[in-house]
Amino acid sequence: MVTMEELREMDCSVLKRLMNRDENGGTAGSSGGSHGALGLLSGGKCLLLDCRPFLAHSAGYIRGSVNVRCNTIVRRRAKGSVSLEQILPAEEEVRARLRSGLYSAVIVYDERSPRAESLREDSTVSLVVQALRRNAERTDICLLKGGYERFSSEYPEFCSKTKALAAIPPPVPPSTNESLDLGCSSCGTPLHDQGGPVEILPFLYLGSAYHAARRDMLDALGITALLNVSSDCPNHFEGHYQYKCIPVEDNHKADISSWFMEAIEYIDAVKDCRGRVLVHCQAGISRSATICLAYLMMKKRVRLEEAFEFVKQRRSIISPNFSFMGQLLQFESQVLTTSCAAEAASPSGPLRERGKATPTPTSQFVFSFPVSVGVHAAPSNLPYLHSPITTSPSC
């Protein structure tokens, strides 16, 4: 077996030349994910793997790279040996190409990537390299010297970073002959309606009913579809955008988890059509945030704590009610402990079927905490609930 000391190293300048050659040839991917990786570097002959945590990758990454999944749960289950299904759960095509020897080289990087001989045996890079050597024996594996930190410093034009949203025009005061019914009785602009929808992923946005009623905001962001997670927020522009409604109340009796897979499939359908979807409820704090968290957990294979921190960095006021947090924790267990073989065979298969909606929840996912959040409560009146994730009133 080849040791870490024998792992080849690649200078940042070499990777830059490869990417520059691809750009000149028109084959480089312009975004992260498997589709970018399949077109990256010499017509898809090389694969770039980002071994950093999900939050770090989401904040900034080398264009075309694929983020591997190697969180604490994966490590604990792996007991020192991870599989391709564990580190690349949603990248079926990438796994197939690796096993078929269709990549001439795989380039791995982390935040700073010390020299190969100094890599710890239990580091993510080491575990990934070992998995590659077992499953892609004919493929050269290289370590990017200096990692993302050095490459992004020297060649920022080849990196993608989370962008601040473009300024959204302020609301236009309604005239005496024209007004817009936003479905709420509050005056002025409450906290949850200030600013615009926030980008969770390039195709996924989170906001409030007010944002969903602002066609100028939606058009400015390129929104093509809306996911309305409420039973009473109107769909204002049904002739202009695609709509889907999930009629869930924001209280401790609501079974929102029974809608997770349907919501995830809808978001994916919009993504596959190269569209963008806004997920909203009344305030964009509890119900719609819960759906976005479930999507990240399922598609990115991350823990609730990681997903929550990721979304909170973008919309600081999110606060799913206690019952929703309990359902998300149960969903986390379902997502992260499902056998890798089952994930590989059916990565988008439903974890549970959604039954007919009934006033009385029958789901085992519902945790009936004696707490509820008013559907139309203003931020100042919201009981910001404390949980293992929401630990401060500011969340």
From Swiss-Prot:
It holds the Pfam family DSPc. Phosphorylation in the C-terminus by ERK1/2 inhibits proteasomal degradation and stabilizes the protein. Keywords: Acetylation, Hydrolase, Nucleus, Phosphoprotein, Protein phosphatase. InterPro entries: Dual-sp_phosphatase_cat-dom (IPR000340), MKP (IPR008343), Prot-tyrosine_phosphatase-like (IPR029021), Rhodanese-like_dom (IPR001763), Rhodanese-like_dom_sf (IPR036873), Tyr_Pase_AS (IPR016130), Tyr_Pase_cat (IPR003595), Tyr_Pase_dom (IPR000387). The modification N-acetylvaline is found at residue 2. It catalyses: O-phospho-L-tyrosyl-[protein] + H2O = L-tyrosyl-[protein] + phosphate; O-phospho-L-seryl-[protein] + H2O = L-seryl-[protein] + phosphate; O-phospho-L-threonyl-[protein] + H2O = L-threonyl-[protein] + phosphate. Expressed at moderate levels in nearly all tissues and cells including brain, spleen, and testes with the higher expression in the heart and lung and lower expression in skeletal muscle and kidney. Undetectable in liver. Expressed in many areas of the brain with very strong expression in the hippocampus, piriform cortex, and the suprachiasmatic nucleus. Its EC number is 3.1.3.16, 3.1.3.48. GO terms for molecular function: MAP kinase serine/threonine phosphatase activity; MAP kinase tyrosine/serine/threonine phosphatase activity; phosphatase activity; phosphoprotein phosphatase activity; protein tyrosine phosphatase activity; protein tyrosine/threonine phosphatase activity. The modification Phosphoserine is found at residues 387, 392. Induction: By mitogens and by stress. It is found in: Nucleus. The active site is at 281 (phosphocysteine intermediate). Belongs to the protein-tyrosine phosphatase family. Non-receptor class dual specificity subfamily. Hollow spherical complex composed of 24 subunits with pseudooctahedral symmetry, has a tetramer as the basic unit. Regulates mitogenic signal transduction by dephosphorylating both Thr and Tyr residues on MAP kinases ERK1 and ERK2. This is Dual specificity protein phosphatase 4. It comes from Rattus norvegicus (Rat).
